[in-house]
Amino acid sequence: DWTWDEFADVLIGVKQYMVEQGMCGENDYIWSDMWCGQTSGYGQGGNLLKLLGASYDINTGWAITTNYGLVYDADSDSFVDGSVSDKYKQAYTVLQKLVQNKVLDPETWTQDDDTALNKFYRGETAIMSTNRAQYAVQDAKVKEQLGEGNYELYRILTPIGTSDYQAENQRLECGIMISSNALNALGEDEFIKMMRFVDWLWYSDEGLTLTKWGKEGETYTVTDGAYSLTPGYYCKGLSIGQTSDDQVDLREELGYACGNFMYSGNTELLTSNLPENLRDFYDRHGQYRQLRTPEPAGNPTKKQK
C-alpha cells in the first residue's frame, strides 16, 4: 500500500534503474497510458485523471461530468466544488511531479489507445491502466512480443491521496432504468410480468449466473465450486483468453458476460471468473481500501450549475 507521492518516488527510482540498465534513455517515459487521449479520453484526461481525482476526493477526468463536477462530502452532507479545493492542487502537484521527472508521458493526453498499448507491449513502458476485460488481452500481447518468462504483470491498488476510498461511489454504473411510459404501453398486468422478469434477471443468483456464464453444460461447467468455460469458448470480458483458433468469444458470439449484467451478485459469483492473481488484487482492496458513502441524488443550485 502507498500514497501517490510514494508511488511517484518509486516510479522515479524505476526510471533511474531502467536508464542504468540500458532499458531506456533519460528522455524516455516509462508510463504512457491509454484511455486518456484522443480515442477515449474525450479531452478530459479520461481514466487516469478519474482515478487520481477519486483518490483526492475530487471529480476530474471521466468523472468531471458527475454532478456537474461537484463532490459529495458525507461529513457535511453537502456537495462541494472540488476544483477550488486544496485537494485539487495536491492531485495535480503529483501529476506534475510525474511529468517533470519524465515518468509520465505527456502524449498520454493526446495519443490514441493503440499507440499507448503498443509501447507497453514492446516493453518500452512499464506501467499501464487495465481492467478485468483488458487484462487478458494485454497479457497475451506482451507474451507475443516479449516471450513467455521474460516479463511479469502485477496489478497494483490505486495509490492513496487524501483518502483510502475505492474509486466508485456513484449510484449509476451498471443496471437498468425503466421509463414510466412502460406502464402505459404494456398495461398493469404485462408491466408486472416484465418487472418480475427484470427482478429475476438482474437480482437473482440464477439470472445473474445465466447472464454471466451462459447455460451450464453448454457454455460452462462447475467443478468443486470452480467455474470454467467449455472448450469451444473464451471470453475477453471475463479475462479468459483464447487458447485455440476454433474458439469463439462468449460475449461477442452469444451476448453473455456483458457489463450491464455481470457486476453484481454474491461474492462467489462476482469472483467466479477471477484467476488467482486477480483474487489477490480484490483481497488487497478489501484489506487496504474503504467503501465511500453512496452519493445522494445530485440537486445543484442554479449558481452551482
Segments predicted by a language model, with ranges:
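Alpha-to-beta junction loops
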Residues: R122-Q134
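Ligand-binding "clamshell"
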Residues: Q138-D164
